Design a protein with these regions (language model features):
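Conserved glycine-rich cofactor-binding loop
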Residues: 14-15
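Conserved glycine-rich Rossmann-like NAD(P)H-binding loop of the short-chain dehydrogenase/reductase
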Residues: 28-42
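Substrate-binding pocket helix/loop in short-chain dehydrogenase/reductase
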Residues: 94-98, 102-110, 192, 199, ...
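Short C-terminal tail/terminal secondary-structure segment
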Residues: 95, 146, 206, 223, ...
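Catalytic Tyr-X3-Lys loop
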Residues: 99-118, 133-137, 161, 209
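Active-site helix of classical SDR
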Residues: 121, 157, 165
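Alpha-helical segment proximal to the catalytic Tyr-Lys
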Residues: 126, 170-174, 231
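Residue(s) in the substrate-gating loop at a strand-loop-helix junction
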Residues: 141
Length: 247
């Protein structure tokens, strides 16, 4: 299996895309470390019940001290980190326009969706430099690539993710580290639990493939970009949007 002996750190692994990526990498041999502000017991069960290897820890990605603590623990236990997947993310819980958005909500979205990605790279990259190997995957969004309504803070954060992905990839390419991001369309995760059937149909129709994406759709792309085979790909943001960006 292509990830045998790999240690993969995945944030936002409690549910949705993070859970899907954790399951996929574990199914191909990685030992997956699932990090989330919520408990990841379900993800752990899904992985270990099918023969995979995983562990979990509760961590707030917006706290640099917690990143340092977890990375130190992981390196002391396993000796190396091969893959970092920064997947934890949120959308605003209030109106998300330039006029109506509250400052506290801006800070929350930017903190989790952008600063959390930076903190992950900041704390993990040094060990990858030492090993001269690393694969980093960040989750951006279609909202980073085109204007979508009521996503002011979210699009700012995800646009920032594409920028720091490109910048960090340039800085660390000579160290054997690749850094890429995926820009999903609308993915059927618990974040959509409260939408109406009408909204679900509207989101589905926006994709050329005419359905919502699934965490598995993103996980397949994530697995390739974090694999040894993707050694000549870095600094890129890849849409995984069912053709939405072509319309």
């Amino acid at each position: 299996m292509r990830f045998n002996s790999n240690i993969a750190v995945i944030t936002g692994a409690n549910q949705g895309i993070g859970q899907g990526v954790a399951e996929k990498l574990a199914s191909e041999g990685a030992h997956v470390i699932c990090l989330d502000v919520k408990d990841c017991k379900e993800t752990l069960h899904r992985i270990t019940s099918t023969g995979g290897s995983a562990e979990t820890a509760v961590m707030d990605v917006t706290q640099l001290s917690e990143w340092k603590q977890q990375v130190s623990r992981i390196l002391n236990t396993h000796g190396h980190i091969d893959i970092l997947a920064n997947i934890a993310g949120v959308v605003a819980q209030t109106a998300d326009t330039a006029v109506d958005l509250e400052e506290a909500e801006w800070d929350r979205v930017i903190g989790i969706d952008l600063k959390g990605v930076w903190f992950g790279m900041k704390t993990v990259i040094p060990s990858m430099i030492e090993k001269r190997y690393g694969r980093i995957l960040n989750i951006a969004s279609l909202a980073a690539l085109r204007g979508l309504p009521n996503l002011f803070s979210y699009s700012a954060a995800k646009g920032g993710v594409t920028a720091i992905t490109r910048q960090a990839a340039t800085e660390y390419a000579s160290c054997g580290i690749t850094i890429n991001s995926i820009a999903p369309g609308t993915i059927d995760t618990p974040i959509l639990a409260g939408i109406t059937d009408e909204m679900r149909a509207e989101f589905s129709a926006a994709h050329a493939i005419a359905r919502l994406g699934t965490p598995r759709d993103v996980a397949h792309m994530a697995a390739y970009l974090t694999s040894p085979e993707a050694e000549f790909i870095t600094g890129q943001t890849f849409p995984c949007d069912g053709g939405w960006s072509t319309k």
